[in-house]
């Protein structure tokens, strides 16, 4: 049997830490935790099952760095010391395997409903906002921005205290950091808006502050969306952003592509994939993770050839928690959805998570 390259160990160059293989469980919303932000045993079991399944890195669901940054019910938080005890239980469980555990830190911004947080949603600018009682978001003041940076920093330090191997800053999918990055959502004319270097200032200041407050060997990475037309994130700006990020002492850039085999929506004459375009734009990049619609071993091998160092997966790991162990077989091509409720229960999804996945067309069937 031929063995896939994805099953081979990988070393983070900056800190000389070795992963067992090149697989990454990407962050996925699962809504399994408690209203006070304490992570539940169900969510721990869900992640632990995938660590037992051989993933090199386990990434938690997005975890809010402040009460006002919460975006959905059942989201666990890291904004208060009361969260640490149960997070230690999570990291201890993951470290009983060979996996690393990374917390994805985020603030929902305009996507944090007032009915959940009790606060008018905060964003880079005053924007139309269905989640606000006023119909508008609040433009972040200098004081707000300072608090945001401190919230991310304090949350990262709590993750260190709780035993995480590192953190991933969620700069993708239209949440707060990407609202600052987007041309259509960042309408500011101060140092936090305008040209890309200003729109990226929040992200860069968060990184700088975190790096000053955690040990040198604590993993710090960033997840970004190469393109989001609705908020004005263009590929040309993402390429420039990657150029800025590669000069920083970070360990990875995670490209959230949704489908790693698709081409750019903006560069219609470009034949290469988003991952190819970005990885071929520079030398000496930090570790590149790419995620989106990888299912089989051949898919994963294809993505490595595109220039990714590590392979992120989401949906396939919901139904196949031991995907990372089986991917070494180059002929591995696991079942696609739909999955039965029984299959998902056996894969350590609780009733709430299964109900949430029923919102995804043709993902869940009763029998």
Describe the role of every protein-language-model region.
Residues 1-367:
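Flavin-dependent oxidoreductase catalytic cores
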């Amino acid at each position: 049997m031929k063995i896939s390259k994805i099953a081979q160990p990988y070393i983070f160059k900056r800190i000389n830490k070795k992963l067992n293989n090149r697989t990454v469980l990407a962050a996925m919303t699962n809504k399994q935790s408690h209203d006070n932000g304490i992570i539940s045993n169900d969510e721990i079991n869900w992640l632990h099952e995938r660590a037992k399944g051989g993933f090199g890195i386990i990434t938690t669901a997005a975890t809010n760095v402040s009460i006002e940054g919460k975006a959905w019910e059942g989201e666990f938080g890291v904004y208060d010391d009361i969260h640490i005890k149960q997070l230690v239980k999570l990291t201890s469980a993951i470290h009983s395997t060979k996996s690393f555990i990374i917390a994805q830190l985020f603030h929902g911004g305009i996507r944090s409903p007032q009915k959940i947080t009790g606060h008018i949603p905060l964003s880079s600018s005053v924007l139309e906002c269905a989640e606000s009682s006023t119909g508008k978001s609040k433009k972040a003041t200098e004081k707000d921005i300072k608090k945001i940076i401190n919230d991310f920093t304090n949350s990262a330090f709590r993750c260190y205290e709780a035993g995480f191997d590192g953190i991933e800053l969620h700069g993708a999918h239209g949440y707060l950091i990407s609202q600052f990055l987007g041309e259509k959502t960042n309408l500011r004319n101060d140092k936090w808006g305008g040209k890309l270097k200003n729109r990226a200032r929040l992200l860069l200041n968060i990184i700088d502050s975190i790096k000053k407050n955690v040990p040198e060997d604590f993993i710090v990475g960033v997840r970004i969306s190469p393109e989001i037309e609705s908020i004005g994130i263009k590929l040309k700006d993402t390429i420039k952003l990657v150029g800025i990020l590669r000069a920083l002492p970070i360990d990875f850039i995670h490209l959230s592509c949704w489908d790693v085999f698709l081409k750019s929506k903006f560069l219609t004459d470009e034949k290469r994939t988003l991952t190819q375009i970005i990885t071929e734009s520079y030398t000496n990049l930090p570790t590149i993770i790419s995620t989106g619609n990888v299912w089989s071993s051949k898919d994963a091998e294809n993505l490595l050839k595109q220039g990714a160092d590590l392979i992120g997966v989401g949906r396939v790991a919901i139904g196949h928690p031991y995907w990372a162990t089986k991917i070494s077989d180059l002929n591995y091509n696991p079942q696609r959805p739909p999955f039965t409720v029984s299959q998902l229960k056996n894969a350590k999804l609780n009733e709430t998570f299964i109900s949430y996945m029923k919102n995804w067309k043709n993902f869940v069937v009763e029998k």
